[in-house]
Each structure stands twice: as structure tokens, then as C-alpha cells.
Amino acid sequence: MAATITDDIVATVLESIEEKSYEDEKEKAGMIKDEANQFFKDQVYDVAADLYSVAIEIHPTAVLYGNRAQAYLKKELYGSALEDADNAIAIDPSYVKGFYRRATANMALGRFKKALTDYQAVVKVCPNDKDARAKFDECSKIVRRQKFEAAISTDHDKKTVAETLDINAMAIEDSYDGPRLEDKITKEFVLQLIKTFKNQQKLHKKYAFKMLLEFYNYVKSLPTMVEITVPTGKKFTICGDVHGQFYDLCNIFEINGYPSETNPYLFNGDFVDRGSFSVETIFTMIGFKLLYPNHFFMSRGNHESDVMNKMYGFEGEVKAKYTQQMCDMFTETFCWLPLCHLINEKIFVCHGGLFKEDGVTLEDIRKTDRNRQPPDEGIMCDLLWSDPQPINGRSPSKRGVGCQFGPDVTSKWCETNGIEYVVRSHEVKPEGYEMHHNGQCFTVFSAPNYCDQMNNKGAFITITGDNLTPRFTPFDAVPHPKLPPMAYANSLFGFN
């Protein structure tokens, strides 16, 4: 496998350390740790994690495992973070940060009871630690709320938010001078909406709820796997994660044209979270979906879920810009988003990837019940969370959910289901895209300079109905207002 930029940086750092003097392996590991700490501070998490790994091989300590766990958390590799936190605690049961790291990883995976157990351990050891007490109290609230929600979920007479909305009762203030949605969505309305968002102004709550309710009712009618036909000679565009980077979304349209009946798009999940313009992003997409329902497609990602939205900013942003009721409405709506798309019966598009088990067919996918929060295993979980790996076979996911699947898995699945290749997203790539598995799997990621720190390009894929060979267009990030990523995220648990 070709060396990456990360590999080159790590090699350079290690060469410089070899040129220095050190008394023993313990001191050498400490020097590598110091270098890794600096890369972590500079938010270069790939290099930091690799350097911590080298130091661990030389002289493993609880601190090294704890530090690498933190780097993995930043990379959203929650499974690896859990494993490192366990190792840190095994080496030193009094290492409090090990419990913190494990709790944070479990929080990200929605395993709140396990997280609460670790926060209890920290509070017991550090009873006067205000931060530990705050985390314990907040996690306790979440566990209590989950118990309450589980209890009322058995109430079949409970109405959805959509059923309780009274949009007509929402008054429009005389001072409101933004877009007005009187009847059906029009192209003029959507373009005015984008202009309003670019000027950092809001759509009125009444119109926002009206759009969201219409979108909710529409996506409920869709199948779990949507089938798309691209006619001969016609272009079709596939985009990956956008993650609330509204101004980069607008740049895609500047480069590739606005969505229309002659310029259709598919956005492959993770519309929201992390980027602090997720509200603007999702309402722009909803606008185009309602305007061009048969030419603008949206697939669910792992971040279109309740747990992720609570941790990574979307819930906080919606509450700040609108209301808790709208958060709840989005939660209900996201559960009805399709899980995947099939283009011309040959291109399979999903957010994450393929499956832990052999034998999954397109018909199995069609029959999958998607109206729920993502489970920890099964077809729906794998579609949202899995990643390709370069070696044959399958491996446990470093994310802690889903699996890693090799080229043999992809080849067999494509042959079984008559698929030419798989398009998925879910992972940052330096050029915005990457080919895997001998051209039978492609990653596309459309959030350039992800979180204002990764320096990656974004990309999108174009095909035509008579030429399904993917063509990639990389693009750079564009400026945005001075609101940092994760501005609305749950800072209490380290998710910002």
C-alpha cells in the first residue's frame, strides 16, 4: 500500500527522535508521546494516534492508551477508543481519564447506562470535581429520560409531533421580511430561501414547520430502497457527507448547477451535525426535495439519528434557532428517510457500506423496517455505519458499530445482486473521494476542510445514463461566517 502523508510525517518525527539521545526505551516512548501531544494540540489527530501507537509498542502505559483513546474519539473511532480506555484502566485502575474516555465513547454510541457507570466511578474517586459531577448529573438525566420515553412508547394512542402541529395558529410578525410560503414550493421561493440563509437570516418558524411537515409526509411514503432511472445521455450527481457546511453546499451548486429536472442529485446522508449551519443545510435540501421530488434524492446517514444529533450539534442548533418541538419533529422525520438507492439497477448507494453477514439481498434490504433509531447490528446498522478495508474478509469496526468489509465481500455481494459497484460516504478522504476494492466500491465525501481543520477537499460524482463510470470532481472549501464548527454541540461531554 502506498505511503500516505500521515505515514511520511510519522516517519520524519521518528527519524528526528532517533537522532537524539535517550537513556532507555521508557524515555524514548516519552519523547514520542510529547511529539504526539503537540500534533493532538494542533488537531492533526491521524498523526497523533499513529505516534501514540508507536510509543505504546515501545513502552505501554495507561496515559498513552488514554491519549490515543482521545485521538480516536476525535476521529469518531469509538470502538478503538473503548478498547484503549479498557487497556488504560487495566494497567492503572486509578487512572481517572481512562473512565472519562470510556464514558465519552459509550455516550457517542448511545450506551448511556454504561457511560453512567463510569461517571459514577469518577465521582466516587473525585467527589469534589465539579466537571465530573456535572457529567454524572447530565448523563443521569439522559438515562432517566430514556426510561420515561421507553415507558410511554408502549402508549399506542400517543400522537406524533406531526399530528399535534397547529401551523395555522403560528402568527407571522409584521416585522418579518423573509421568504413567504403561501402554497406550494416554487423555484423562486427556494432561491430566495438560500439568499436569506447566506445573509444569516432565518426562515420564519411557521414556514419552516410547514416545509418540514410536508417533507415528513412525503418521505413516509417512500420505500426503504429507492430505485432511480437515469435516462440515456442524462447526467446524475451523487454527493457525500455535507455535515452542516451550508456555504460549501452552495458552492457545489455553483460548480455543478442548481438541482432541477434536468440536473438531478442524490445526497448520501450526514446532512447535519458538526457544521454550525445544519439548519440552513437541511432546509435547503428539503426545499429542493419538495420542488423536485423525482429528481432530488436524500439518503439517511448515521448522523440522522437522535443520539448523534444530541451530541454533535444539530439538536442544539435547532433549539437555538427554533424550538425543542422542531427537534422532535426532525427526529421523527429522519426515521423515515430511505436507507439506500439503486441507480439503473447497477449502482448501489448507501451511507456506510456492506454487511456483517453473507447472503443479504436487495429484497432483504427492501423489507427492512427503517422507522426507528439505528440499531447496534443488522442490515440497517451496516448500511449506516460500515466501512471498506483493503484486506479480504471482515473485521470489527473501529467505530464500535457496523463492520469493516474487504474486497472479496464486495465482489461476492455485487455478483449476487447484479451490481456493478457500490458508492458510499461516511469517511473523510484527502481528495474528497477514494476508490476501493478494484473499482467495485467508491467513497465520496462532500464536506471540504471538514470541521475547519482537516484540510481535505470535497468531491462529488457524476454519471450519465449510458455511461455509469463514475467521474469525480474535487473542490476546495469556501469561506463562511465566523461561527466555528460544533458551536451548538454538547460541550459537557467533549463533543466540541
UniProtKB/Swiss-Prot annotation:
Which Gene3D superfamilies does this entry report, sorted A to Z?
3.60.21.10, Tetratricopeptide repeat domain
Q: Which species?
A: Caenorhabditis elegans
PANTHER family, per database record? SERINE/THREONINE-PROTEIN PHOSPHATASE 5-RELATED, SERINE_THREONINE-PROTEIN PHOSPHATASE 5
Q: Where is this region: Catalytic?
A: 184-496
Question: Which EC numbers does the record give?
Answer: 3.1.3.16
Which keywords describe this protein according to UniProt? Cytoplasm, Cytoskeleton, Hydrolase, Magnesium, Manganese, Metal-binding, Protein phosphatase, Repeat, TPR repeat
Q: What is this protein called?
A: Serine/threonine-protein phosphatase 5
Q: Does the keyword Cytoplasm apply?
A: yes
User: What changes when the gene is disrupted?
Assistant: RNAi-mediated knockdown causes no visible phenotype.
EC supergroup of this enzyme: hydrolase
Q: Which residues bind Mn(2+) 2?
A: 270, 302, 351, 426
**Residues the entry annotates as binding Mn(2+) 1:** 241, 243, 270
Catalysed reactions listed for this entry: O-phospho-L-seryl-[protein] + H2O = L-seryl-[protein] + phosphate; O-phospho-L-threonyl-[protein] + H2O = L-threonyl-[protein] + phosphate
| Keyword presence, Repeat | yes
Q: How does it assemble?
A: Interacts (via catalytic region) with daf-21/Hsp90 (via TPR repeat-binding and central region); the interaction promotes pph-5 phosphatase activity.
Cell location: Cytoplasm; Cytoplasm, Cytoskeleton, Spindle
Superkingdom of the source species:
Eukaryota
What does the record say about how the cofactor binds? Binds 2 Mg(2+) or Mn(2+) cations per subunit.
Family matches, as PROSITE patterns: TPR, TPR_REGION
Q: Which family does it belong to?
A: Belongs to the PPP phosphatase family. PP-5 (PP-T) subfamily.
For this protein, the activity regulation entry reads: Autoinhibited. In the autoinhibited state, the TPR domain interacts with the catalytic region and prevents substrate access to the catalytic pocket. daf-21/Hsp90 probably releases the autoinhibition by the TPR repeat.
